[in-house]
Amino acid sequence: MLIGIPLETAPGETRVAATPETVKKLKAQGHTLRVQASAGVAASVTDAAYATAGADIVDRARALGCDLVLKVRSPDAAELALMKSGAALVGMLNPFDKDGLQRLASAGLTSFALEAAPRTTRAQSMDVLSSQANIAGYKAVITAADHYQRFFPMLMTAAGTVKAARIVVLGVGVAGLQAIATAKRLGAVIEASDVRPSVKEQVESLGGKFIDVPYETAEEKEAAEGVGGYARPMPQSWLVRQKVEVAKRVAAAD
């Protein structure tokens, strides 16, 4: 099978859909890999690395004109025009974008949106949401530390004491947990809020403090349990109380 890995063209996008290691594995299975020139440069992967792994370095038209195309982001109109009808597309395709899905269908593509992969043990290797959220949580704290005008940890020196930065994390999913862990390693004091009571233990295990908002009705408690690890919309009455508690922490946060 011809497998294409084109250069991502979305503004600010630096990722690439496959690494040389992936190319090597697919090559060993008998596939022919075509990588667009400079596809991995923004991700610090050279064309030479792909060539060494067994890929052919080609132009955009040849990379997009394969039987299977691997992309990070959904193709734009110009890219769709270069893809052949009947080809397969795998990537993060934003399955909630109905117009975008219609364009893919109109182009005759069989598309697989990796965001829709179930969160099960067997599908863990395809869980792009968790892997990218992990990176986002880490980078969010690193970026915050870069913009913050003081230190994150408490420092005691002969010149005086610098208090630790106080951070509030909203949402304790994969990104939130990584943000808490990263901020804690940098020495910050963290408080976190989430609608699900089950994450309180996770927050505390990472050294953070959970912002507890008690449930006053059975409806609130049922909604907070979530489904399949995902939170559900909470009743307005609970959201009002959460807003009050979070506002107190935000006012004192750095």
Question: Where do the model's predicted regions map?
Answer:
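Glycine/serine-rich phosphate-binding loop and adjoining beta1-alpha1 elements at the start
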Residues: L2, E8, A77-R166
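Small/polar-residue-rich loop-to-helix segments that shape phosphate-bearing ligand pockets
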Residues: E115-V141, H147, K209-S237, A251
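Glycine-rich phosphate/diphosphate-binding loop of Rossmann-like nucleotide-binding domains
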Residues: P6-V45, P153-R249
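Short gly/ser/thr-rich secondary-structure transition/capping motifs
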Residues: T52-I57, K71-R73, Q149-P153, Q236-R241
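Short beta->alpha connector loops at strand-helix junctions that form conserved
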Residues: A37, R60-A61, M92-L93, L114-P118, ...
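An N-terminal-biased, well-structured beta-alpha scaffold segment characteristic
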Residues: L2-R103, A107
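Residue-level detector of alpha-helix initiation sites
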Residues: S74, I135, G173-V174
